[in-house]
Regions:
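Structured alpha/beta reader/binder surfaces that contact nucleic acids or chromatin modification marks
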Residues: 2-173
Length: 173
């Protein structure tokens, strides 16, 4: 698998062309600029348990940037390896927002490695409302539009039984 960051956090991520085409990717939305900064600086992303997609397990996260990103809107530009999952209350993840209406709700905190930039951004020419997309590294490499990521996988994936824990072999604390 090239020299990319593995799931225990050692090594370095090189580029998307060195990764196995069959590795699973979850495309997730970055609602605001601060969510990109949290991913980049703090190394994590959050998903409310109440909004968990049906196929949540992935080895990588890729990030869709909506209209709030101005000139970089409606694109996927960044991806990162998933290191581990943990459940936490929103107020633990965002202590500066103790009065938030969802402060007591449970979230998955997904620890990620360093963000890498795709060679070319993947635009959403027609599709604008994206929450989660299950795809593969191979599909991410081939996509010319976000809609291409919804096509059936052309890459051979391990059977779902291997992913039985639902967390692709990552630790859950």
């Amino acid at each position: 698998m090239g020299g990319h960051l593995n799931h225990q956090g050692s090594g370095m991520i090189h580029d998307i062309w060195e990764l196995e085409a069959t590795e699973r990717v979850l495309v997730a939305i970055l609602p605001q600029q601060r969510d990109l900064e949290l991913a980049r600086e703090a190394g994590w992303y959050r998903v409310p348990l109440a909004r968990l997609p049906s196929h949540f397990a992935a080895e990588y996260l890729a990030f869709y940037q909506p209209a709030t990103f101005g000139t970089e809107r409606w694109t996927i530009r960044y991806y990162a390896p998933v290191l581990r999952y943990r459940i936490a209350l929103r107020r633990e993840l965002l202590p500066a927002e103790p009065q938030h209406p969802r402060a007591e709700e449970r979230y998955y905190q997904i620890d990620i490695g360093p963000l890498a930039t795709l060679p070319l951004p993947i635009p959403a020419r027609r599709l604008r409302r994206v929450s989660f997309i299950n795809t593969t590294i191979g599909q991410l490499r081939r996509a010319h539009d976000v809609a291409d990521l919804f096509h059936p996988a052309e890459d051979a994936q391990p059977p779902d039984e291997i992913w039985g824990a639902g967390l692709a072999g990552h630790s859950l604390t």
